[in-house]
Amino acid sequence: MQENKQPSEIQGELPQPPDGESVPPQPTNEQAPPDTDTMPRIEETLRQLELKAAEHHDAWLRARAETENVRRRAQEDIAKASKFAAEKFAAAMLPVKDSLEAALTIEKQTLESLREGVELTLKQLNAAFQNGGLTEEDPAGQKFDPNKHQAISAIEAEGEPNTVLNVLQKGYLLHGRVIRPAMVMVSKAKGT
């Protein structure tokens, strides 16, 4: 009769082969025989992942093409904006040109009517400038600013040095940016 062995002792013992025979190794979890259902499942999973990868690649290509189209359209818009930036201003200049041409067609003008015509044309021109964001810089009596003024000469004068005494030619700003500095005469301290 066999002795009653403890479960821990039973687990550690392997069955012994009869004398002279060898026992083939028992499969363990690491050496499990291939499951016949596993390969088709792996192939199906691989096929699904390949489809998803193809979808993602296609979406990436579409996004890349769309980005390129947006970039190209933006460049075209910038080129058009640059090309036609002066369109509004040019349209505002046309009535001024028309007025000047009309004045030249009148053969017998009085000095007074010519003056009135020039004043009206100047008003049209000033309105066009104002609508286009072009403003005059007339700095008489102001402190000299080298960013907005160009000093033609300096004259000894009473008062604060570097003050604009006389404006020889007005300056112009386009939306606050100097496009032509005012040509000015400035004061300097006596004896310098």
From Swiss-Prot:
<comment type="similarity">
    <text>Belongs to the GrpE family.</text>
</comment>
<dbReference type="InterPro" id="IPR013805">
    <property type="entry name" value="GrpE_coiled_coil"/>
</dbReference>
<dbReference type="InterPro" id="IPR009012">
    <property type="entry name" value="GrpE_head"/>
</dbReference>
<dbReference type="GO" id="GO:0042803">
    <property type="term" value="F:protein homodimerization activity"/>
</dbReference>
<keyword id="KW-0143">Chaperone</keyword>
<keyword id="KW-0346">Stress response</keyword>
<keyword id="KW-0963">Cytoplasm</keyword>
<dbReference type="GO" id="GO:0005829">
    <property type="term" value="C:cytosol"/>
</dbReference>
<dbReference type="GO" id="GO:0051082">
    <property type="term" value="F:unfolded protein binding"/>
</dbReference>
<comment type="subunit">
    <text>Homodimer.</text>
</comment>
<protein>
    <recommendedName>
        <fullName>Protein GrpE</fullName>
    </recommendedName>
</protein>
<feature type="region of interest" description="Disordered">
    <location>
        <begin position="1"/>
        <end position="43"/>
    </location>
</feature>
<dbReference type="InterPro" id="IPR000740">
    <property type="entry name" value="GrpE"/>
</dbReference>
<dbReference type="GO" id="GO:0051087">
    <property type="term" value="F:protein-folding chaperone binding"/>
</dbReference>
<dbReference type="GO" id="GO:0006457">
    <property type="term" value="P:protein folding"/>
</dbReference>
<dbReference type="Pfam" id="PF01025">
    <property type="entry name" value="GrpE"/>
</dbReference>
<comment type="function">
    <text>Participates actively in the response to hyperosmotic and heat shock by preventing the aggregation of stress-denatured proteins, in association with DnaK and GrpE. It is the nucleotide exchange factor for DnaK and may function as a thermosensor. Unfolded proteins bind initially to DnaJ; upon interaction with the DnaJ-bound protein, DnaK hydrolyzes its bound ATP, resulting in the formation of a stable complex. GrpE releases ADP from DnaK; ATP binding to DnaK triggers the release of the substrate protein, thus completing the reaction cycle.</text>
</comment>
<dbReference type="GO" id="GO:0000774">
    <property type="term" value="F:adenyl-nucleotide exchange factor activity"/>
</dbReference>
